[in-house]
């Protein structure tokens, strides 16, 4: 079972819900829920086959890119810097699973 992957998916999902409650951004909520579900699906696939990292890798790369750009513009650690950093760590972890 890919507990780290499921934890990452839960963090993204609950982070989008928390952000919606705090700021009220519906597009951000929808995008966060979609990406969180996609990360959860990727963790499910990794749980069944350790080498099946395509969905998880795509999701982490997508989030690292989007949130990295947001962090570069805003210079704010929360939430963009945190999510970009966690996504980069997920990418590293998934690449190591392939070795």
From Swiss-Prot:
Can you quote a single GO CC term?
A: mitochondrial membrane
* Family matches, as InterPro entries: TMEM14, TMEM14_sf
From the UniProt record, give one GO term of the biological process aspect.
Answer: regulation of heme biosynthetic process
**Residues annotated as transmembrane:** 1-21, 24-44, 79-99
Q: Which UniProt keywords apply?
A: Apoptosis, Endoplasmic reticulum, Membrane, Mitochondrion, Transmembrane, Transmembrane helix
Topological relation to the membrane, as annotated: Multi-pass membrane protein
Q: Could you tell me which Gene3D superfamilies the record lists for this protein?
A: 6.10.250.1330, Transmembrane protein 14-like
Query: What tissues express this gene product?
Result: Expressed at significantly higher levels in ovarian cancer tissues than in normal tissues (at protein level).
Q: In which compartments does the protein localize? A: Mitochondrion membrane; Endoplasmic reticulum membrane
Identify the Pfam families for this entry: Tmemb_14
Cross-referenced PANTHER family, in alphabetical order? TRANSMEMBRANE PROTEIN 14, 15, TRANSMEMBRANE PROTEIN 14A
**What family does this chain come from, according to its entry?**
Belongs to the TMEM14 family.
Q: What is the role of this chain?
A: Inhibits apoptosis via negative regulation of the mitochondrial outer membrane permeabilization involved in apoptotic signaling pathway.
Q: What is this protein called?
A: Transmembrane protein 14A
């Amino acid at each position: 079972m890919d507990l780290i992957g499921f934890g990452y998916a839960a963090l993204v999902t609950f982070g989008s819900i928390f952000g919606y409650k705090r700021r009220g951004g519906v597009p951000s909520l929808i995008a966060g829920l979609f990406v969180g579900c996609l990360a959860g699906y990727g963790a499910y696939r990794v749980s069944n086959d350790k080498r099946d990292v395509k969905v998880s890798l795509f999701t982490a790369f997508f989030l690292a890119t989007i949130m990295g750009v947001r962090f570069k513009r805003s210079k704010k650690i929360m939430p963009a810097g945190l999510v970009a950093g966690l996504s980069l760590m997920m990418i590293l972890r998934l690449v190591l699973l392939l070795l």
